[in-house]
């Protein structure tokens, strides 16, 4: 393989790629030669301030607008692409090379890519993974998502860090720089826009109890649905409100002893109550938490009656349900290396995060909530619980996917809280 890649780097084997060398027998899975060759198409990303970055195009021939952001994860690009929280965003990866393990159908976080565009330093010319069935190039092309490689992703990241999140236009079509800048400026942004309705479930459904068995690499370790003597634990019926949930969260809930029933974001409190759940879960999702006011009213009513756990947007919706507010971060927290301190235990965890809004600490405390965790980078709120109700939430992603598993015990905490409440 090393000799193969060395020769590929020298361009000596470009015409033969995927045909003259058959390394499948050695455990390598390569995409076709047509997809591995570097494209001659060009593309660009234009920011609202007129800044232009040009590079090589991959993925779909298309033009999209959205908010530009960056993610510092080294791996997990497939989970990032399919995370509904990225709906309406153009994502830049800070890792140098992306795509080297292809796309695996078992690792998706939704029914397809949700990003508006994807920007990387380099797309790997080889996708080597026995579990993958396609390359990232083909995957994005089929989904209609444009991508650009060969750009200075470090410069883009530094720009967003200094300027804050910017509206942008990504194109792999033949349009002028002036037109691209104009389209970026015309994008409405995220504030005040309800993107949840674009990604929530269309109807209520029962999470497939066999789903976990069909994804053996998602959950590792002891079966937490069993007691120490291997007898089954009680399974609690959870009403999961889908604001744009990642599949990994449902898998984690199931793995930790919950019978997961998913409901669209617009489901009323009366409909949830008629289902008679043991508890409520509030998922992640895209956009401005202040724009989903219908969910604020629903959750305000539900937390009066049911043990509730919220993640990411779900955490922010609890904030609004309590009468507190959220605000937009300068450039957000996106990556698998965010340090979070638990103010009650003093413990620091490294967490996976993906959010552009945060809860206002002063207003939460005035509303009677206890702020339990903060981000050590900027001291924004990362967790809360209520003093007199079985309700807690976190801003980060304890299910990871991708990222560290430091916060996985939160699912155990949720189970134990429900068990105590149900009696």
Go through the PLM ranges and name each one.
Residues 3-5, 13, 23:
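Short hydrophobic targeting helices and cationic amphipathic motifs
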Residues 18, 25-27:
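Residue-identity detector for glycine
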Residues 37-239, 243-270, 274-275, 289, ...:
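RNA-binding accessory domains that recognize and position tRNA/RNA substrates
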Residues 74, 354-359, 396-403:
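Glycine-rich phosphate/pyrophosphate-binding beta-alpha loops
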Residues 235-239, 259, 307, 350, ...:
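Residues that mark the start of a beta-strand
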Residues 274, 278-279, 283-350, 356-358, ...:
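Cysteine-nucleophile active-site neighborhood
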Residues 346-389:
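Catalytic beta-strand/loop cores that center a nucleophilic Ser/Cys/Thr
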């Amino acid at each position: 393989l090393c000799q193969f890649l060395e020769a590929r780097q020298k361009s000596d084997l470009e015409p033969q790629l995927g045909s003259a060398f058959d390394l499948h027998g050695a455990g390598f899975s390569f995409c076709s030669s047509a997809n591995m060759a570097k494209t001659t198409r060009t593309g660009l990303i234009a920011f609202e301030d007129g800044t232009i970055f040009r590079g090589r195009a991959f993925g779909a021939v298309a033009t999209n607008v959205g908010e530009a952001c960056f993610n510092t994860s080294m791996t997990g690009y497939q989970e990032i692409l399919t995370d509904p929280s990225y709906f309406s965003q153009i994502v830049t990866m800070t890792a140098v090379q992306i795509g080297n393990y292809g796309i695996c159908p078992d690792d998706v976080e939704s029914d397809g890519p949700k990003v508006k565009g994807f920007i990387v330093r380099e797309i790997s010319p080889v996708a080597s993974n026995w579990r993958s069935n396609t390359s990232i190039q083909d995957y994005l092309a089929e989904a209609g998502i444009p991508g650009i490689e060969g750009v200075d992703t470090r410069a883009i990241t530094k720009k967003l860090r200094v300027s804050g999140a910017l509206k942008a236009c990504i194109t792999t079509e033949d349009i002028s720089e002036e037109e691209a800048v104009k389209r970026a400026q015309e994008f409405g942004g995220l504030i005040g826009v309800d993107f949840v309705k674009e990604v929530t479930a269309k109807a209520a459904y029962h999470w497939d109890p066999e789903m976990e068995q069909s994804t053996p690499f998602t959950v590792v370790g002891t079966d937490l649905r069993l007691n120490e003597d291997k007898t089954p634990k009680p399974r609690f019926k959870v009403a999961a409100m889908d604001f744009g949930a990642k599949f990994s969260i449902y898998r984690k809930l199931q793995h930790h002893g919950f019978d997961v029933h998913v409901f669209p974001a617009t489901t009323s409190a009366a409909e949830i109550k008629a289902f008679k759940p043991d508890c409520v879960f509030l998922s992640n999702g895209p956009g401005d938490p202040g724009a989903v006011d219908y969910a604020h009213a629903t959750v305000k009513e539900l937390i009066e009656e049911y043990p509730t756990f919220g993640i990411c947007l779900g955490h922010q919706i609890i904030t609004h349900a309590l009468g507190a507010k959220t605000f937009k971060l300068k450039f957000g927290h996106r990556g698998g290396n965010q340090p979070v301190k638990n103010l009650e235990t003093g413990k620091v965890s490294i967490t996976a995060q993906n959010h552009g809004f945060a809860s206002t600490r002063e207003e939460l405390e005035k509303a009677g909530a206890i702020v339990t965790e903060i981000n050590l980078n900027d001291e924004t709120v990362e967790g809360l619980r209520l003093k007199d109700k079985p309700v807690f939430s976190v801003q980060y992603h304890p299910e990871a996917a991708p990222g560290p598993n430091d916060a996985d015990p939160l699912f155990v905490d949720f189970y134990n809280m429900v068990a105590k409440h149900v009696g």
